[in-house]
Amino acid sequence: MKKLIFLFAFSIAVTNIFAQTDPNQIKKEGNDAFNAKNYPVAYAKFSEYLKQTNNQDSATAYYCGIAADEVKKYAEAVTFFDIAIQKKFNTGNAYARKALALDALKKTDEYVATLEEGLKVDPNNKTMIKNYGLHYLKAGLAAQKAGKAEEAEECFKKVIPLDHKSYKTNALYSLGVLCYNDGANILKKATP
């Protein structure tokens, strides 16, 4: 009798350990956690769901990326936003959020490349326009302060085509200052 009870208890334990939770239930739990802004739980549930479904749900991948970003798992966020981009779900915002995650990882070249790629797909995405313009304005000002006029000029010229009035104005103003300073330096060298 003891062996029978032990065998019964053992089989129940093994069944519970190896039983797969229903993916739809996991997704629902992830959605509930996400809506409650409980991002660690949402990330765990969404990533488990995506693992079970072989990353087939682009919307869940996008929201898992947001949850990963919120819990500062930026590398994982990039991976999930890539899935959303590949499956063409909310592409513009997926590019914008991927870029922000790359920026948090201090991968500046990939950050800029992602913004450029994203702007080709969604040229009116305000977040990408803002981040791209701000990046090149800061880079141009840093180059200008370092005495690298040509590099600064290139940075400012990348901002001008953007549809952001204040960034465009700042870039044009900075280009004007750059030209003025260049002229002043030439004049200074010409007069003894």
Q: What name fits each language-model region?
A:
Residues 24, 58-59, 93, 127, ...:
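Start-of-helix register in tetratricopeptide repeats
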Residues 59-64, 97, 131, 138, ...:
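Canonical tetratricopeptide repeat
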Residues 49-50, 83-84, 117-118, 159:
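Canonical positions in the second alpha-helix
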Residues 54-55, 89, 123, 164-166:
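Short coil turns that delineate tetratricopeptide repeat
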Residues 35-36, 70-71, 83, 104-105, ...:
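Register position in tetratricopeptide repeats
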Residues 2, 17-63, 70, 90:
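N-terminal leader/linker segments that initiate helical-solenoid repeat arrays
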